[in-house]
Amino acid sequence: MKTNIIPTDGMVITEDTTFAPGTYALPNGITIGADGVTVAGEGVLIVSPQQVGVGVAAQGRRGVTVRGLSLNGFYHGLRFDDCEGVTVQNVNVRGTQEIEGIDTFLYLWLPIEKTYGGAILLNNVRGGTLLNCDLQHQMNGVLLYNTSGVTMEKCNASFNSGWGVYLSNANENTIQDNQLDFCNRVYRRPEDGSIRVEADAAAIVLVKGSSRNRFLRNSCLCGGDGVFVAGYEHPGVVTPCNDNLFEENDCRLSPNNAIESTFSRGNIFRRNDCSRSNYGFWMGFSWDNVLEENIVEFNRWVGIAVEHGHNFTIRNNRIRLNGEGVRLWTRSAVGEGVMPYWPGYEVAYDFTLENNLFETNHTGFMGYTGEKITDRECRAFHLRGNTFRDNRVGASFSRVQDSTLSDNQFVSNVEAAVRLVGKPGVTVGANTFEANAADVAEI
């Protein structure tokens, strides 16, 4: 091992190396040029003045480790391509390339050749660990392209103007125990000049079929979205992000959606806090999803919103103090927007809601077919074993068929426990009604 080495601009490292503490201007960075190499640098800061190039790069290497370095001012702080078994530990990255601000809406589907700047980029990497890294105050924290088997743990990628963690065609990775707070972006809408926090910034983003990943115990507070899963690029590019697990993440305080997961199948959302946002969950055009044991409170519009979705299980959630607790509905007309690319998704159907608490919402449950769909209706909404307490309306149905209410408790709902608009096809079975203004109101 080489120790106390003064790094030089563009140097290639082929054996274990520890740099001497200090600040070094290396606009061409350094390259790891052999397998099994460790580069260490406690007290070392490597800088570039122009936000171009890469601070530490490796291509086609195995078993490389970077530990303890600080980097500032590159396009990417660290970049690994076509590698296996990469470890990045206790690294600090700041000041990587960032696009212009208020008038730029982010594009979620950039190819690797045009990727945004960021602290760490892994492309076509198999296996690795990102541990205890500080990746705050730039555009993006970690970018994973075509990468699998990587664990990102105990990193801080907060206060970024794009994404904390971004996955594009990235599968079977684990993202756990990270701080990914305040990843948001101010955007001026060109049509009217209004300014909002949006532009598809988020703590966690999945695109291009990123599947079978695990997201555990991450803090995603105050993101543009907390989590954004986007399985479709308009027009006609269908790449669902399937079979991911989101468990015990804190996604509160988004001005948009605590969790948005669209056009994707088989995702599980368990014990997340999706509160104090415009929407807790936005789940359009998704299917075969499970939402269980989540906290969904104080959302401005809707706690759980699913348009044009099907085959959901929504169980054991605490759904309180929202505008609407759960909304299942249709919005688009046949032939409009994305509908030509999603045949069979004209209505919402096959939902099971069981053992949830709906409390102090304006409307606990809302199921309806929108006015733009005229030749068919939503169907098979089955609500059983739920408690509806102190809502203005417990459960409301309009233009819905083959649906059931059974074994639910309706207590102290202010206007009605159940509201049926226009004689929908809803069977009200054996439920418990207590102290409601009306038990079943037909309008």
Positions of PLM-derived features:
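Extracellular "leader-to-stem" segments immediately downstream of a signal peptide or signal-anchor
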Residues: M1-T31, R67, Q89, R94-I112, ...
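Extracellular beta-strand-rich solenoid/capping regions of secreted or surface-exposed proteins
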Residues: I6-T14, A25-T38, V47-R67, L71-T87, ...
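Detector for repetitive beta-architecture
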Residues: G10, D16, T23, G29, ...
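Generic detector of contiguous secondary-structure segments
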Residues: P21-A34, G68-R94, K154-C183, D200-G223, ...
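Acidic/polar low-complexity surface segments
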Residues: V47-A57, G77, Q89-N123, G128-N132, ...
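Ankyrin-repeat and related helical/solenoid repeat scaffolds used for protein-protein interactions
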Residues: E359-T360, M366-A430
